[in-house]
Amino acid sequence: MLPFLRDPAACLVPVILTALLLLAIGYLLGSTPSGYLAGRWLKGIDLRDCGSGSTGATNVLRNVGKGPALVVFLIDVGKGALAVLLAKTFGLSDWLQVLAGLAALAGHIWPVWLGWKGGKAVATGFGMFLGLAWPVGLACFGLFMAVISIFRIVSLSSVVAAIGLPLLMVVSGGSSAYVVVSLVASLMVLWRHRSNIERLIAGTEPKIGQKA
């Protein structure tokens, strides 16, 4: 670990440059269009024009298949985790770690390569919190799986996990930076699921195995 990265007052310029570099890397990692590529390469389709219009793993599952959806899910998880772990490797503060993670989320939701239309940040957010505070990340995943096993609705599971995230972070004693970013990430996921929430309220949201 580089000592000056823990003491910005000692040498501010390297800290700023390192932070900006990691933010750029985080965004580029997040914007890697794994779901879009799976649709193009395997089915010759543009996921933005299919189903929910998302490039995430759920839309891949519905329109491409289970195997590709699993691969896309793992890649998307890795994008969020890697962005945070790079910041940790360079010894950056909690606040800069969470900014790197948020950059990955932003890249996933608004990828420059796809006209700013990407996924819904669930898998990438999961990876981000595995990197920041893995017990909280695993707890959210457990909550997600519990809801999906009962109701078989991915969006409902995502919404419940997003709501539970900041609560779990507070209970776990996470730092102020981690608590704040858990709330921000939760709001980002909920905002991306606003159409799903409308369908959930109307009772028209499809279950696993049904077309959107």
Curated annotation (Swiss-Prot):
Catalyzed reactions per annotation: an acyl phosphate + sn-glycerol 3-phosphate = a 1-acyl-sn-glycero-3-phosphate + phosphate
Main location: membrane
Listed EC numbers: 2.3.1.275
Pfam families to which the protein is assigned, alphabetical: G3P_acyltransf
Transmembrane spans: 9-29, 67-87, 95-115, 128-148, 168-190
MF term (GO), any: acyl-phosphate glycerol-3-phosphate acyltransferase activity
Membrane protein topology class: Multi-pass membrane protein
Keywords, in A-Z order: Cell inner membrane, Cell membrane, Lipid biosynthesis, Lipid metabolism, Membrane, Phospholipid biosynthesis, Phospholipid metabolism, Transferase, Transmembrane, Transmembrane helix
Localization in the cell: Cell inner membrane
Keyword Cytoplasm attached: no
Keyword Iron: no
Gene Ontology terms: biological process: phospholipid biosynthetic process
Subunit (UniProt): Probably interacts with PlsX.
Its biological purpose: Catalyzes the transfer of an acyl group from acyl-phosphate (acyl-PO(4)) to glycerol-3-phosphate (G3P) to form lysophosphatidic acid (LPA). This enzyme utilizes acyl-phosphate as fatty acyl donor, but not acyl-CoA or acyl-ACP.
Family: Belongs to the PlsY family.
Protein name: Glycerol-3-phosphate acyltransferase
Provenance organism: Parasynechococcus marenigrum (strain WH8102)
Organism lineage string: Bacteria, Bacillati, Cyanobacteriota, Cyanophyceae, Synechococcales
Gene transcribed to yield this protein: plsY
